[in-house]
Amino acid sequence: MKTCIALRAVPELRELREGLSTVDYMTAAIAHIARNPAAPGKKFNLTHSGERNLSLEDFFDRLERAFGFSFARVPFRDWFDRWKDDAATPLYPVLNLFRDPMHGGMCMVELYQHTYRWEHANTSAFLAGSGVRPPEFDEPELRRYLVQSIGIAPACAAR
């Protein structure tokens, strides 16, 4: 995210979902489910279901609408070439995820396009009526997310 903001560019990766969430939601969901004696032995996917499971495209679209950012959508390899030789780039420590071919000449990140959606029935059922809700990623949540996770205050960054 920080690299995309610095470059004012987003790679064209389709339906890449990263399970974006908040610590508040995750901890509240885990604590609530763990207290239920019917939970042991069941699987709980805390990745959000449906439209709340934002793709990379959705996330940056929301940043543009909420804060006035403007991101160029560029082919993945062009985007990668913009930062791959800069060791100061936030993504540089995980360069291999973007560079090394894993299958069919594609790197790990490219392979995660068109990401599957996790089954969510147990989580939804166990959280029903609890008041524990996944984040909406509306403007106030996006602002907190940017400030707390990467130290960028959106009002200043978009200018």
List each model region and its residues:
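Amphipathic terminal alpha-helices
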Residues: 117-159
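Ca2+-coordinating acidic residues in Ca2+-binding motifs
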Residues: 25, 58, 122
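Residue-level signal for the nucleotide or nucleotide-sugar donor/cofactor binding architecture
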Residues: 21-24, 54, 118
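Mid/C-terminal beta-alpha module of Rossmann-like enzyme folds, strongest
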Residues: 33-106, 125, 152-159
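Short, contiguous acidic/charged loop-to-helix segments that flank catalytic cores in large enzymes
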Residues: 17, 50-51, 110-111, 132-134
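A conserved pocket-lining segment of Rossmann-fold NAD(P)-dependent short-chain dehydrogenase/reductase
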Residues: 1-25, 29-33, 45-47
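Amphipathic alpha-helical segments that line or abut small-molecule/effector binding pockets
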Residues: 24-35, 61, 143, 147
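Short glycine/proline-rich turn/loop motifs
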Residues: 5-13, 102-107, 125-129
